[in-house]
């Protein structure tokens, strides 16, 4: 009995005009995810996945490269306007927003969604180097 060839389904590129850029900037890495208004991920990129390893992942330039890679993928969807949500204290916060702006997106608003505990969990002990 002959096997039927498995056909790879072609992803239909839907047209999205408005999107949300979620930037997670930690001290060690920066993750950029661009979604539509409903929260469905269109593209994502990280500083580590962009070819930076070790301490170079936590640089503003690595975050900028990750944002540029993400913007490149999302251009195919016809995205024009971006709402930016930044989470975390990392060094890639500002450079990521600048890179998205330079990529040609109109940034409608920037929101800081860093979680701040109301005296929740005990923080880790201070480093002694």
Curated annotation (Swiss-Prot):
Species whose genome carries this gene: Haemophilus influenzae (strain PittEE)
PROSITE patterns in alphabetical order: RIBOSOMAL_S11
Self-association and partners: Part of the 30S ribosomal subunit. Interacts with proteins S7 and S18. Binds to IF-3.
Stated family: Belongs to the universal ribosomal protein uS11 family.
GO cellular component assignments: ribonucleoprotein complex; ribosome
NCBIfam families, A to Z: PRK05309.1, uS11_bact
GO terms of molecular function: rRNA binding; structural constituent of ribosome
A Pfam family hit: Ribosomal_S11
Coiled coil: none
InterPro entries given in the database record: Ribosomal_uS11, Ribosomal_uS11_bac-type, Ribosomal_uS11_CS, Ribosomal_uS11_sf
Protein name: Small ribosomal subunit protein uS11
Keyword field: Ribonucleoprotein, Ribosomal protein, RNA-binding, rRNA-binding
Function in brief: Located on the platform of the 30S subunit, it bridges several disparate RNA helices of the 16S rRNA. Forms part of the Shine-Dalgarno cleft in the 70S ribosome.
Protein's GO biological process: translation
């Amino acid at each position: 009995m002959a096997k039927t060839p498995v056909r790879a389904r072609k992803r239909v590129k839907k047209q999205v005009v408005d999107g949300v850029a979620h930037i997670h900037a930690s001290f060690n890495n920066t993750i950029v995810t661009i979604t539509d208004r409903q929260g469905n991920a269109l593209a994502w990129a990280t500083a580590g996945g962009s070819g930076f390893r070790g301490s170079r992942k936590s640089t503003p330039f690595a975050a900028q490269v990750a944002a540029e890679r993400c913007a490149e993928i999302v251009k195919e969807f016809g995205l024009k306007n971006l709402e930016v949500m930044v989470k975390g204290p990392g060094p890639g916060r500002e450079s990521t927003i600048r890179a998205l702006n330079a990529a040609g997106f109109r940034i409608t608003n920037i929101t800081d969604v860093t979680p701040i505990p109301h005296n929740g969990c005990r923080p880790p002990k201070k480093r002694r180097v």
